[in-house]
């Protein structure tokens, strides 16, 4: 089965972001790339001079997520990254296929920037953090000279950070680690920015994901909202400021 469609630039105009560093964006369960691109319209505007945001569709058909039909009822089909929210061992190959398809399509659209980060909401945030842990494991094995290849994303394992909107813990096992090591026994050490809505019913589970990350490399942005992507200027500005601060500290390298 072919991976579902991706979403990048959706018109034929010249795109000034093609040479910028790229951030792969993973939607929440029960939405899709097109919806997530719209939900991220304010953060995209804040970062438009610094990053190109590219939106991928999850591999699994899904019913619409909470409150999705009220605004986006005609924007289906809806997708998910996991076949069921309770899944602990995801279908890594299908996730990798969707990510690789979105990346390849963006290359064909003329984009040339390095893939420097991940950005996800809800289920997509959990998957994004888990992908970052997989990369960390792979890098640790490389340092130990064990030489390990782990699938479709082996050649694109240079993410520098992840922005995690309302992502739940614990981390998922995406592979690239010791067969006897579960992700809950490890801390994610690569830089993460956690965005929590203080009125979100799942807030404590989002704090679980924060606790899965090394304190010195995890940043927290809190805003007075529920389970959605913030769009108020002051809330989004706080997230964008954290991303720009990472860049100013050299986290993003030359990409």
From Swiss-Prot:
One Gene Ontology CC term in the entry:
nucleus
Q: Which InterPro entries match?
A: AB_hydrolase_fold (IPR029058), FSH-like_dom (IPR005645), LovG (IPR050593)
Which domain of life does the UniProt lineage start with? Answer: Eukaryota
Disulfide bridge positions per record: none
Q: What is its EC number?
A: 3.1.2.-
> According to the record, what happens upon gene knockout?
Abolishes the production of azasperpyranone A.
Provide the alphabetized UniProt keywords: Hydrolase
**GO MF annotation, one:** hydrolase activity
Biotech application, in the record's words, is: Azasperpyranones display potential anti-cancer activities. Azasperpyranones A, C, D, and F exhibit potent growth-inhibitory activity against the A549, HepG2, HCT-116, and HL-60 cell lines, with IC(50) values of 2.39-14.42 mm, respectively. Moreover, azasperpyranone D significantly inhibits HCT-116 xenograft tumor growth in BALB/c-nu mice. In addition, azasperpyranones A and C can bind with four kinds of therapeutic targets for cancer, eEF2K, FGFR, survivin, and TNF-a.
Q: What turns on this gene?
A: Expression is induced by the azasperpyranone cluster A-specific transcription factor ATEG_07666 which is itself regulated by the azasperpyranone transcriptional regulator ATEG_07667.
Biological process, per Gene Ontology? secondary metabolite biosynthetic process
Q: Does the keyword Signal apply?
A: no
**Gene3D superfamilies, sorted:** alpha/beta hydrolase
List of catalytic residues = 122 (charge relay system), 200 (charge relay system), 227 (charge relay system)
Pfam families assigned to the protein according to its UniProt record, in alphabetical order: FSH1
**Role:** Probable esterase; part of the cluster B that mediates the biosynthesis of azasperpyranones, members of the azaphilone family that exhibit anti-cancer activities. Azasperpyranones are synthesized by 2 clusters, A and B. Cluster A is responsible for the production of the polyhydric phenol moiety while the azaphilonoid scaffold is produced by the cluster B. The non-reducing polyketide synthase ATEG_03629 produces 5-methyl orsellinic acid, which is then reduced to 5-methyl orsellinic aldehyde by the NRPS-like protein ATEG_03630.
The Swiss-Prot or TrEMBL record describes its family as follows: Belongs to the LovG family.
Q: What is this protein called?
A: Probable esterase ATEG_07663
Recall the taxonomic lineage recorded for the source organism: Eukaryota, Fungi, Dikarya, Ascomycota, Pezizomycotina
